[in-house]
A protein has these predicted regions:
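Bacterial N-terminal signal peptides
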Residues: 5-15
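Non-catalytic pre-domain segments flanking phosphatase-related domains
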Residues: 17-92, 276-288
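Soluble non-cytosolic domains of exported or imported proteins
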Residues: 34-45, 111, 125-133, 158, ...
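C-terminal cap/substrate-recognition subdomain and adjoining C-terminal extension
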Residues: 45, 162-288
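Surface-exposed patches in mature extracellular/periplasmic domains of secreted proteins
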Residues: 55-67, 75, 149-154, 190-196, ...
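Active-site neighborhood of HAD-like aspartate-dependent phosphohydrolases
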Residues: 87-88, 98-140, 144
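Structural recognition of the beta-strand scaffold that forms the well-ordered cores
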Residues: 89-93, 99-101, 148-153, 194-198, ...
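Substrate-recognition element of Asp-dependent hydrolases with the DxDx(T/V) motif
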Residues: 96, 126, 135-182, 231
Length: 288
C-alpha cells in the first residue's frame, strides 16, 4: 500500500508540472548571460582588429571556393586573385550573427510552441530583432575602413498571401523587412557597393547552402572575411555532414578560424543540431 501511495504521489506531482521547453536553457543563456555577451563582443573585436590588414591583403580570400577558382588556398597569397582587382568585402550572416532573434524563441517557449515557417515569417515582418553584441560597432568600423558589407541570410523570400501595412504583397517582402530591421537596430544604411542577399531571391539561390550565393559575390568581390553562427556560413556543403565530419573539417581549417573566419556561438538552433542524426541525441553524450 505504501508503494502505491508513493507512486500516486509521484504521478500527481508530475502531472502538475510542464516539461521544460527544449530551447529554454539555450535561450536564457543568450538573453541573460554575461558570457554570451562577452563571447560575441570578443569575436567581433578580433574581427575588427583584422579589418585593415585583410583589406590590404589583395591576394588573399577567406572563401575556399573563391580561392580554388584561382588555383589557390583560402588564407594564402594568390597572385591571380590580386591581379583581379576585386572589391574587398566582409560577408556576414544575419540571424544570430548581427540580429538577435531570441525574443522570438522566448515567445515560443512561453506559448509552448515550436518553430514554424509562418510564425517565423510573422516575426521577420515585425522587424523587432535587436543587434547581437559587438555587431553594430564592427559593421560601422568595416564601412569606415572602406570595406563592402555583404549580408547573406537564409531568411527566405516568399510572397505573403495577405500583405500588411508594413509589407504589402510583393515577391520578397522579407528583404524590405530585413533592411528596415537593420536600420531600426542602428546599422548603417546599405550603399551601392553593399549587398543583402536572401535565400530564394533567385531560383538558383533556393538552397540553405550558401555556395551559389557566395559564388555570385565572388565574381565582383574578394571575400576577405566570413562571419556567422553556423559552420555553413563559412564553408560550402558542410551543413548536412555528420558530427565527426564537421569536427574533422574544423581541424583541417583551424588556421582560418580567428584570422579569416569568425564563428559566433548559437546554442539555440543550427546545422549542429541536424548533425545529431541516426541515433537518439542522448547517445551522443560523452560519459568520459
Amino acid at each position: 500500500m505504501k508503494t502505491v501511495l508513493m507512486l500516486l504521489t509521484c504521478f500527481v506531482f508530475m502531472s502538475g508540472c510542464h516539461a521544460q521547453h527544449d530551447s529554454m536553457d539555450a535561450t536564457l543563456w543568450v538573453q541573460t548571460s554575461a558570457e554570451y555577451q562577452g563571447n560575441s563582443e570578443m569575436v567581433f573585436n578580433v574581427a575588427e582588429s583584422r579589418l585593415s590588414l585583410l583589406r590590404d591583403k589583395q591576394g588573399v580570400t577567406a572563401d575556399i571556393d573563391q580561392a580554388k577558382s584561382f588555383g589557390c588556398l583560402a588564407g594564402m597569397s594568390c597572385p591571380g586573385l590580386a591581379a583581379a582587382g576585386l572589391i574587398p568585402a566582409v560577408v556576414l550572416d544575419i540571424d544570430e550573427t548581427v540580429l538577435d532573434n531570441s525574443a522570438f524563441l522566448a515567445r515560443l517557449i512561453k506559448n509552448g510552441g515550436q518553430w514554424q515557417p509562418d510564425s517565423w515569417d510573422d516575426w521577420v515582418a515585425e522587424r523587432a530583432a535587436v543587434p547581437v553584441p559587438g555587431a553594430l560597432a564592427f559593421v560601422e568600423r568595416a564601412k569606415a575602413e572602406g570595406v563592402a558589407v555583404i549580408y547573406m541570410t537564409n531568411r527566405r523570400c516568399s510572397v505573403r498571401e495577405a500583405g500588411n501595412e508594413l509589407s504589402p504583397k510583393q515577391p520578397c517582402p522579407q528583404k524590405l523587412d530585413t533592411l528596415e530591421n537593420l536600420a531600426s537596430a542602428g546599422f548603417p544604411p546599405l550603399v551601392p557597393v553593399d549587398l543583402l542577399i536572401l535565400r530564394g531571391e533567385r531560383p538558383e539561390w533556393d538552397s540553405a547552402e550558401k555556395q551559389t550565393r557566395r559564388q555570385y559575390v565572388a565574381e565582383r568581390y574578394r571575400i576577405m572575411m566570413l562571419i556567422g553562427d553556423d559552420l555553413g556560413d563559412l564553408a560550402s556543403n558542410i551543413k548536412k555532414s555528420s558530427v565527426e565530419e564537421r569536427a574533422r573539417f574544423v581541424s583541417a581549417h583551424e588556421f582560418l578560424l580567428g584570422n579569416y573566419w569568425f564563428q559566433l556561438t548559437n546554442p539555440t538552433y543550427g546545422s549542429w543540431k541536424s548533425a545529431l542524426k541516426g541515433k537518439p541525441a542522448q547517445d551522443y553524450l560523452r560519459l568520459d
